[in-house]
A protein has these predicted regions:
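Extended two-metal-dependent nuclease catalytic cores across DNA- and RNA-processing enzymes
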Residues: 1-4, 37, 64, 90-255
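Domain-level signal for Mg2+-assisted phosphodiester chemistry and nucleotide/NA-binding surfaces
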Residues: 1-108
Length: 256
């Protein structure tokens, strides 16, 4: 059983994969500017900057490390969305400059050293994990911070939730929040290999989402695009996470 304690201070959720990528390349960049690079231990530098990040965020948001949680991805070939889109995320190209061993190091050595709270569940991506918990606690807390650079999280934006990247930039500002999931389902997501609906462009989608929801569905039906849209929205909208997986995660979490 994993405890999530509700406090007066903000609760911070990290998309674990995003953070590791960010810190990995930020550490490499930092090392490149040092004079004696040969005598710098990468993992020691990574850990030192990781701790600095935690301290900086605690100070920025007036919270404590005990209020920080990391959402962890399941294995890509076990993601529940694969059942609905066989090519989901299949076209992602590995960065040859990135050493994936840092994931295991973070989830074991760094986790134990800093007593990190990593949350994962079979078949769920990190954003699924965070979305499910977010829904459970959003009416019980004063402030939630989500740290990511993934626009999928934009749908979690509300008056109590701030969604930022590690540069502390609000990633929701560049998006139209009105009917956001509908918009994203219409235009697709190349990074996840989700194709757009028909030949709808971003400009067309911007116009469509101004309509009342019932008119949007009527328009899609009239143009024989409703099936494509439904296929996309099922993958994109967190409300379509299978109930069984939601229950699996929540059965192992105690919100106190």
């Amino acid at each position: 059983m994993f405890d999530i304690k509700i406090t007066k201070e903000p609760i911070v959720f990290f998309d674990c994969s995003y953070y590791i990528f960010h810190r990995y390349f930020a550490t490499k960049r930092w090392i490149s500017f040092q004079k004696d690079t040969e005598n710098i231990n990468f993992l020691e530098a990574f850990e030192r900057h990781f701790e600095n990040d935690l301290n900086k965020l605690c100070k920025k948001f007036k919270t404590t490390r005990s209020n920080m949680y990391f959402g962890v991805d399941c294995y890509r070939n076990t993601i529940w969305r694969n059942e609905y889109l066989k090519t989901y995320k299949q076209h992602r190209v590995e960065n040859p400059e990135f050493d994936r061993d840092i994931f295991d190091y973070f989830k074991t050595t760094i986790k134990d050293k800093f007593n990190l709270k990593l949350i994962n569940c079979d078949n769920l991506e990190a954003d699924d994990v965070i979305a499910i918990i977010h829904k459970e606690i959003t009416n019980k807390v004063n402030n939630i911070i989500i740290i990511t650079n993934d626009s999928d999280y934009v749908q979690l934006k509300n008056d109590k939730t701030t969604i930022i990247n590690m540069q502390l930039k609000d990633i929701t500002l560049k998006h139209n929040l009105k009917n956001y999931t509908i918009y994203k389902a219409l235009i697709g997501d190349k990074s996840d290999n989700i194709k757009r609906v028909g030949k709808i462009t971003k400009a067309t989608a911007d116009k469509i989402i101004q309509k009342p929801t019932n008119e949007i569905y009527e328009w899609l039906k009239e143009n024989e695009l409703l099936t494509e849209y439904n296929n996309n929205i099922r993958i994109i909208d967190f409300n379509y996470i299978p109930e069984e997986l939601i229950n699996n995660l929540l059965s192992n979490i105690n919100i106190i």
